[in-house]
Amino acid sequence: MMKKIILLSFAGFMMVTLTLAQMGQKESPVIAKGAKLIRLSDQYSFTEGPAVNKNGDVYFTDQPNNKIIKWSATDNSLSVFMDEAGRSNGMYFDKQGNLITCADLNNQLWQIGMDKKVKVLVKNYNGKLLNGPNDVWIDKKGGIYMTDPFYIRDYWKRTPVTEQDGQCVYYLSPDKKKLTRAADNFKTPNGIVGTGDNKYLYVSDIADRKIYRYDIGSDGLLTNRKIMCEKNSDGMTIDHLGNYYISNEKGITVFNPKGEQIEQIPIDEKWTANVCFGGKKLDKLFITALKSVYIIDMKVHGVR
């Protein structure tokens, strides 16, 4: 069956009805029956870093314009939460309701309160600038994992030469006092997400086209690296069944915990950057893709 795209304008939104190849043959294991992919907006420059708060609202970045945008789970509205957002990329909410962001302008990790006050959590490793924190995930203890690939940015004021001896994954202790290299041996680590039980951590190596799974140790260190699939991915999320979702030029691809592909959600964009679950019941998949943001109803839900 061919993919069919129908665009319907209404109330400032755009609905994209997708007939997927597998739909019509069998019911999707993750997408709600009859669900439609809805484009909320295409007014941005490059969307990234979706993160859900305790109310189900999703915050995401319009990175080139240095803004953080809020999508309201209550009324479907979009509004600017913060200007001058440190060129934030990947983001995640902590238990206190602060937004933890990979502030790439000065290669830092920020904590942003809902009053918009900024606290710099990490600005270097062993006295040397980080490459550029890219994506972040927080465990149940409050420890923070972040990827640190090296992408040269045209807005940097620093010398465009790495000061680190690798592109790694770091772990910031729950008390925010100790930064440790949790895993290395990557070409370009990018997306990152952990399972709801905090047993496993997934990391995408976008340049090497691999998704790795690690065991999470009690000290935060990562062991038993395993290749789960050989795909490139920018962002990642996970649902309550342990299925993990990756984003790339093909849209969103879903794998079960065994690494078997179970769904493909095509996005009519050249690149899909990131994804998370949002909504009051965490049953909407929120997708950032170039100038646009999308949502689709799911039969599974996300985890915090």
Language model segments and positions:
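Bacterial Sec-dependent N-terminal signal peptides
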Residues: 1-25
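Sequence-structural signature of mature extracellular/luminal beta-sheet repeat domains
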Residues: 22-304
